[in-house]
């Protein structure tokens, strides 16, 4: 079984490596999103160092990210699924918003064009393991590592 400290360290490491995109205030919108005066927001990249915020990425959510007033973090899990991912990408683009997409390795392998679209649109892409087993807490460490690494090490989109 995976100990909770392994899960916390793994999640913290992933957050550190990925950074997060944060939806900000409309004040900076004009410079970041020309031609969309009525768009909802803009984005900034927020890199979270787990040494400074060790609780980020844990299941308990006892600590939040260092956000400004009216900021939220948008994340989407378990894609890319062409039907839904394309709709979400259009909505985000229409409003000049960036997000983080945690994709499943098997979905990425089946839909590499979807991953390319996420990256080309400027979104952050992270892993949600190879096939998103719901039994991580009861899985032997070597199998969990294979799941995590399989989601990370798939073919790079070109």
Locations of the language-model features?
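Bacterial N-terminal signal peptides that target proteins for export
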Residues: 2-15
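Bacterial N-terminal signal peptides
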Residues: 12-24
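Boundary at the C-terminal end of the N-terminal hydrophobic targeting segment
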Residues: 28-31
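Active-site beta->alpha N-cap acidic-glycine motif
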Residues: 40-143, 147-154
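Active-site acidic/histidine proton-transfer and metal-coordination neighborhood
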Residues: 158
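N-terminal module-boundary/linker segments of secreted carbohydrate-active enzymes
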Residues: 34-36
